[in-house]
Regions:
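C-terminal catalytic "cap/lid" subdomain
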Residues: 1-205
Length: 205
């Protein structure tokens, strides 16, 4: 209300379908949960869970980060948007689920929130995708003499920078991937990656 917004806000607990044959399930990368001792880690392994050791700290679970296939509650999200409501959905990337015998079963995984955001923007046929992060502008050639801020680039340029490894696998890369996939689905779209503090300025160009 302080911002003069008087629309109804709805929050949806969101499930996101993932592919059980996604390669990510064979190479888990997402570390999560509390630290465990040797006995607890051994018990987790016996359950079939992956565990990784962090020297000097202990052991933690490590899970897959599969790609989002579709959003289960997308029709509800669309209905609320059509009713002119502000919708909060897909928090944390959504709850990963697998389709099994006409049922949904929870998956031991974490979905990249940026990819889920892109999937939701795609499935709601949004015109723009905005991803907020901690930096005002994305840079290439970080910490080098040729370091450069990116202001406006094409999809082809973004893909080239990704292939050259400018964004790191777990930091800026998922954001660029989400933006590229969103833009490639339909012409006339835009994607913006910036910080919350600079969002208004960025929207004005």
């Amino acid at each position: 209300m302080d911002r003069g917004i008087y629309r109804t806000v709805s929050t949806i607990l969101t499930q996101v379908i993932v592919d059980p044959y996604d390669e990510a399930f064979y190479t888990p990368t997402k570390v999560l949960g509390r630290y465990m001792d040797v006995e607890e880690a051994s018990a987790e392994r016996k359950k079939g869970n992956y565990v990784v050791e962090e020297p000097g700290k202990g052991f933690r679970r490590i899970v897959a980060a599969p790609n989002p296939v579709s959003i289960v509650e997308i029709d509800a999200i669309k209905a609320l948007l059509d009713a002119d409501q502000v919708v909060i959905a897909c928090g944390g990337g959504g709850i990963p689920v697998l389709e099994q015998d006409h049922r949904l079963k929870g998956a031991s995984a974490v979905i990249e929130k940026d990819l889920t955001a892109g999937k939701m923007a795609e499935e709601t046929d949004a015109d723009s995708l905005i991803i907020l992060t901690s930096v005002e502008k994305v840079k290439i050639n970080m910490d080098r003499p040729e370091e450069e801020e990116l202001r406006e680039i094409s999809v082809d340029q973004a893909k080239a920078y990704m292939e050259e490894g400018h964004f790191g696998k777990y930091n800026m890369y998922p954001k660029f991937r989400a933006a590229v996939e969103f833009l490639e689905k339909r012409e006339g779209r835009s994607a913006l990656i910036t910080s919350f503090d600079k969002l208004d300025e960025a929207l004005k160009g």
